[in-house]
Amino acid sequence: MEQKSIRKAIIPAAGWGTRFLPQTKAMPKEMLPIVDKPVIQYVVEEAVAAGIEDVILVTGWHKRAIEDHFDRSLELEKYLQARGKKKEFSEIKRIAELANFIYIRQKGDLYGNAIPIITAEPVVGDEFFAVLWGDEFIWADPPRLSQMLKVYKKYKGAVISAVRIEKK
């Protein structure tokens, strides 16, 4: 297969978030805020900055808030415009237009990191793609995905990221 640029990213976001209970009983862990936005928004923005065009979010039945976050809300937009809240209006519109969002509902009681990737196979086809965890935020300069795509282009093969953890 000829090497092409990576345009698609799969973001698994179907888990229960049990390590964060009780906070995640009513809110997906991917929607937990870091400062002023949910962690998954940082992940999507990093992907888009690295050249990703199609963001494939593999979610579960209890993750509707993720879809709502990245979707347009015409009622909210109208409300904000009527009250002159231009900054807020621009930001929610920008979020909805970050990428081409594709949502896939993970079915059944299957569990594991490979299941969302297999679930997204019909959308990805035979293209190379990135996998980003919807609840993982790593601050790096340059951003981690950009670093990985640079390695991918240089060596023309799969790339896995690792983080060194200091012993205490």
Question: Where would I find each of the regions flagged by the language model?
Answer:
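Conserved beta-loop-beta/alpha segment of the NTase-like Rossmann-fold superfamily
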Residues: L76-K78, K86-K168
